[in-house]
Amino acid sequence: MSIIDIANNILRKYCLCDRCLGRLFASLGRGLSNDERGKAIKIALVLELHKRYLDGDKDSLKQLVELSPNIGPIAVNLIKNLGIEIEYTPRTCFICDNKINDIIDTYSQRIADIINERHINSFVLGIRGVTSYIRKEESIANEFKLLYWENIKRELKREIGKKIQMMTNAKVDFLNPEAMIIIDIDRDRIYIESPSLLIYGRYWKLGRMISQNIWLTKNGVKKYPLSIEEIAKMLVKDGFGDDVVLHIAGREDVDVRTLGSGRPFVLEIKRPRKRNIDIKDIENRLNSISRWLKFELNMFVDRDFVSRVKKGCRTSYKIYRAIVVADRDIGIEDIKRLEEFFRDRIIEQRTPTRVLRRKKDVLRRRKVFEIKTRVISPRVFEALIKCEGGLYVKELISGDNGRTVPSFSSVLNANTLCLTLDALYVHEYI
């Protein structure tokens, strides 16, 4: 059966707009929109019936008159030109109720306005809803055993996407879009999910009693006056995005400063309001909030980079500076013995007593590569400690009542405590 015969049978029963008719034959022909395809099929059908009428088939004219309300003006105008008066009342499309063009135009404009406002450079489109339209077109496809039709959602995605690209500088990108746009036609809603902006950088803690995360007591009061997370979340108030998350290479205690090379981290801005932001604007904003924290932002990264940063902290080495106090005088021989003993030494640590309430009691093995020491006073000395990531340095010094072995205390046969601790270098494997 020819396309014209199939279209004839369909239009005898259903009024269809050009787009919805063309969509039933969407896989036939190249370079045509469904609107053009449907109009061409209607014209071809009208021409064929007119030809048959001119060839003497009087039933063809009757057939054309019967079809005209479902075909539309193309058929009606021909019938009138043949001198036949007919009453014509436009009918609505059985599938889309004559709404599909309005849907395409309206949502294209709304989304284009959003894209221009947010400076989005690439997007991918999805459609929800239109279930009643889908049900109707599926019933026609099944009734007439159509093989070349396409779903209305597919046409809406394609046509709205094309118009958006014409109205903006944004392009469709299926692999790495800056925005995922979902149109819920039944609810008349547009949802825009922008993939997070991920920015790699480093931070420095120039003071003590600064936590990485906001730490609240049971009463909801901040336990520490300042946190890195708190500073980062200022970006939400400034309108950079809906939320901010920090992915940090390891952590240090609140009373430990981070100096030297700083600590690597990735700043994640969720659902960013704009994509083409200047990293230095964010860096300047972060650095303007507290003189006790310094940030340096270097580059945009992908999600895989975040994993490498977090994984690298477990395999990298770190250098700390500790000020240590002992309960007896420490001489030059003690210092030499300490340095020699902790050269490439494996340390066994059970979870420190001070964190047992929130961490599982497990045995960890970490390596101390070397230490360098300098006597400050008879019972106070400075130690530079190069060690594997994940080592509890305070417990390396104190021994934690035998939970860390060996320790400074066990080697020196003295009670030693860490007075202050600074992280000087965090090596990266990324």
UniProtKB/Swiss-Prot annotation:
Which residues bind substrate per the record?
320, 392
Q: Which Gene3D superfamilies match?
A: 3.30.70.2510, 3.30.70.3190
The Swiss-Prot or TrEMBL record annotates one GO molecular function as:
tRNA pseudouridine(55) synthase activity
- Give me the reactions it catalyses: uridine(54) in tRNA = pseudouridine(54) in tRNA; uridine(55) in tRNA = pseudouridine(55) in tRNA
GO biological process terms, semicolon-separated: tRNA pseudouridine synthesis
What are the protein's UniProt keywords?
A: Isomerase, RNA-binding, tRNA processing
Assigned EC number:
5.4.99.25
Q: Which InterPro entries match?
A: PsdUridine_synth_cat_dom_sf, Pus10, Pus10-like, Pus10-like_C, Pus10_THUMP_arc
Residues annotated as catalytic: 253
Per UniProt, what is one Pfam family of this protein?
A: Pus10_THUMP_arc
| Protein function | Responsible for synthesis of pseudouridine from uracil-54 and uracil-55 in the psi GC loop of transfer RNAs.
Family the UniProt entry places it in: Belongs to the pseudouridine synthase Pus10 family.
Protein name stated in the entry: tRNA pseudouridine synthase Pus10
**Which species?**
Ignisphaera aggregans (strain DSM 17230 / JCM 13409 / AQ1.S1)
Lineage, please?
Answer: Archaea, Thermoproteota, Thermoprotei, Desulfurococcales, Desulfurococcaceae
